[in-house]
């Protein structure tokens, strides 16, 4: 079954370490990113990015795994 919405939540716990790398991945995988929303949470020392992805399943999995491998980054998924 093909999903209509695949949402990734990215919590950047260490923005001084991870922000640039997350941004590079977002740019590199721009063809599968349909929508993104960033929420700055200074009181938590980081921020959240919500990303709606679409396209090739292999590319989506690679994007998720590369994000999850970054130090200071936590990745969660919602699939509808």
Where are each of the predicted segments found?
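Long, contiguous binding/interaction regions
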Residues: 1-80
């Amino acid at each position: 079954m093909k999903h209509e919405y695949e949402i990734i939540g990215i919590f950047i716990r260490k923005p001084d370490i991870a922000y640039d790398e997350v941004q590079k991945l977002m740019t590199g995988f721009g063809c599968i990113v349909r929508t993104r929303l960033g929420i700055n949470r200074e009181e938590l020392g980081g921020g959240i990015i919500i990303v709606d992805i679409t396209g090739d399943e292999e590319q989506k999995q690679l994007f998720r795994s590369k994000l999850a491998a970054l130090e200071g980054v936590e990745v969660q998924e919602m699939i509808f």
